[in-house]
Each structure stands twice: as structure tokens, then as C-alpha cells.
Amino acid sequence: DLAAGDIDVVVTAPINKENVQEAGFGFTGHTEFFADRFGGEPLMVMCSERMKVGLVTIHVPLAQVSGMLSTELIVRRLEQLRRMLVTDFRVVEPRIAVLGLNPHAGDGGVIGSEEEEMMRPAVAEAVRRGILAFGPFAADGFFASGSYTKYDAVLAMYHDQGLIPFKSLSRSGVNFTASLPVVRTSPDHGVAYDIAGKGVADEGSMRDAVYAAMDIFRSRRWYGEISANPLRHYERERGADVSVKDLKLPEQQDD
């Protein structure tokens, strides 16, 4: 129904990843499932009124994170995050902070080399492409000092690096799968079997996920409408301003 356009968005409820594997689901989470079904390279982003945190890597063991990182991947994630902020959240010139992988963001290569070898070059390349990217920053001081409030989004290198401060600082949040042709959101919590049937569950995040999906769909449609037929930039070709002719009505065109 989603692919056929019969519904506009999808909001998924929490799943138990162990149980769905036993049922033959075949994916580590909803994010990977939707990427497989609809194509594209998904970007997992946690969203709240206080912050937006994107992840370079998602559901992978921590021991594998460093080996998966590369300058090219980080640049792609920055491009995805910027595109999402512009099209889905109407941020005209988003500022994006990049977190380092190692303690103290590597201390100039003393505590790991990923920052110097991959992250700084990635930030520099992103800036060259017109993205307002900054960093890499040491994650602990970045959040403890409140520096995250100066940016429209934060790019974390791995799952817990982004989600621990997000859940600690945001009372409620939404998981948004960006960079897909469809809009998919979910609450920012798990199945919570420990409180099942006790009448104490908080519906806030699920409600926020529904509202966020609606808002993102409307923003994406709005952006598509305003950018569908842009006027050509003024250019000079052989001394003639070709855009002047382009902007005339058909009956006004010179032969």
C-alpha cells in the first residue's frame, strides 16, 4: 500500500529484534527492512524539539565501527543529513556538528587516528561542497557543555554515541529513517516488556512519531512544490543574457 501510494506515511511500533529473527524476518531492524524494500541508503536520525542526531553506522557491533568508517561514508552521511534538514524540516542553511570516534576526539592522533585520517578530511570535503559542517568534537564535552544547541543536527559515528545523550537530554523523541522515498518514523523506545500490562506506559513518543510523520510528509511535499520549476540563473553566453529570452512568454519570443 505504501509503495502504491495508497497511504502517505508509515509509523512502526517497537519490535523485539531477537524474536523477529526467529520468525525469519531477516533484517536487524525496521531501518534495514525499509531500505531493502524501497531502495536507497537509509540514514537513521533521532529527532526531538531539542536536537536531531544522525548516525553514520546503525545496528552493528561496536568492534566493527572503526573498520566501517571512511571519509567517503562520512561525507555521504553529511550530504544526507543536510538534504533531510532542508527538504523535511525546512532548514535553509543547516549547521551540522560531527562527533569524533575516540575519547577527546583523538587528541591530535594520540588516542586513535580516525579523526585525523578520516573525519577532518570528511568535514573539509563537506565544506568544499557547500555543507556547513564542523568538528570533529569530543562527544562528552560537546553534550555536557550544551554545544549541541548551536547546531541544527549532530552526526554521531555509532548507535550508542548518539542515542545515549539524545535520550538523556530529550524527554521524548522520534526515530526517523531519512533518505528513503517514503516517510517512516517510530517511537524512540523498545518493547518494554517489563511494564507490559501495568498501565504505566507513556504514549508520548508514539504520538510524536505519528505527528512527525505527518509534518515530514507535508514539508517534503511543500519543498517539492517550491523547487519543481525554478527560474534559471542569469547567465551570459556569447555576450547575451539567455535567461531574458527564457523568461518571456511564447508570443513574446523573438524569432
Per-region residue spans from a language model:
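Anion-binding alpha/beta catalytic cores of soluble intermediary-metabolism enzymes, centered on
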Residues: 1-114, 120-255
